Amino acid sequence: MLKKLLGFDPQTMALRTEIIAGITTFLTMSYILAVNPSILATTGMDKGAVFTATALASALATLLLAFMAKLPFAQAPSMALNAFFAFTLVQGMGYSWQTAMTAMFVEGVIFILITFLNVREVILNSIPMNLRFAISAGIGMFIAFVGLKNAGIIVPNPATFVMFGPFTPVSILAMVGILLSGILVLRKVKGALFYSILICTLIGIPLGVTEIPDGFLPVSIPHSMAPTFCQFDFNEFFTLDMAIVIFTLLFMNIFDTVGTLVGLASKTGIMEEDGQIPHVKEAMMSDAIGTTVGSMMGSSTITTYVESASGIAEGGRSGFTLLVTGVLFLLALFFAPLFLLIPSAATTGALVLVGVFMMDSITKVDMDDISEALPAFITMIMMVLTYSIADGMVLGLLCYVLVKLGCGKHKEVS
């Protein structure tokens, strides 16, 4: 039954491993439940309503993918697209949040249509094999960089762009987490990343990093979504500018999702010899449905999360991993004060170790052929330097086409 519903094979998979993987995936991406409401609230949206919408949309999309695609790739609101929503569409271009949310709803509907017509699948399967491996490694570098930046280990510098940050309780806790995660992994402790997060959260209490508020109660009643539910506004919708906005949202989501799916599929070993990803259409459809329903609730665009790699690193291989993750998103509605105690610094070790795990795919890139190695390198480094998986992919693909054409290998450009 579990094999048919979730792809869980008891003969080759362990239920305990899948459960730990699901918990680990949730813990490493649960920050979105705190960050997404904070970002969208800058537009005037009700923070409590957005929190509820974020948790429900994440649970819905993740559970859909669990049962439809049977893969351990969790989904939640995109950090790139929620920033685009708040800081570009609303604060930059002057649209109301209702109009901007309408654009995301329409984008989600278009997503469903082009996924049904296999357009996104064609895009995914047209990516050259060496670039797929480079995307996986690049995402690993990106994840590690995000963890180091959020912990203050890497900070901005006007002269060199980035530099090693000062020693603070947050950065020290993050460094401890990196070492602890590495040691636990080397000792082959099952659930190493999960235990690292829990231990660092406890260590953070005396350091003042894990903050326990006065009158703390671990359980709360979910906030109503009434202030954001289906609050659409089509008054400013039928314009050329809005058409460009929708196209941009579509483009960003396609490449974010495609890049992440390729990287995670490479890491799990499910990618077939010809580079095809099993159940990719179902994975993309759950993304599209999640985006559409999420925008109706009051959440920004849904995408596949690179943090799923943390659960994969713990051994998650089936939809059962996502069943656990999805249920935890639902429980988070009632235990929001409890899981919000986990500081981002406590997850840094997991993110860095995941980056290490994903880097092994670079060994599969043909580095002796510069026409393959250069686009692969551009893909990886630009993901980090532009702070965007999508930008890294686009630049890598562009480099691939131009280099192949330039050296007379036009037949290799599909």
Q: How would you label these PLM feature ranges?
A:
Residues 47-48, 73, 97, 389:
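Membrane-helix interface/capping residues of multi-pass secondary transporters
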Residues 93-206, 210, 323-414:
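Membrane-embedded alpha-helical modules
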Residues 61-74, 183-188, 249-256, 287-297, ...:
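Transmembrane alpha-helix interface/packing and boundary motifs in multi-pass membrane proteins
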Residues 2-36, 57-58, 78-87, 91-136, ...:
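Helix-loop-helix junctions within the multi-pass membrane cores of secondary transporters/permeases
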Residues 1-49, 162-163, 195-281:
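Helix-loop-helix hairpins and the membrane-proximal interhelical loops
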Residues 19, 39, 123, 191, ...:
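Residue-level signature of catalytic and energy-coupling elements of molecular machines
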Residues 44-63:
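Loop-to-helix transition at the N-terminal end of transmembrane alpha-helices
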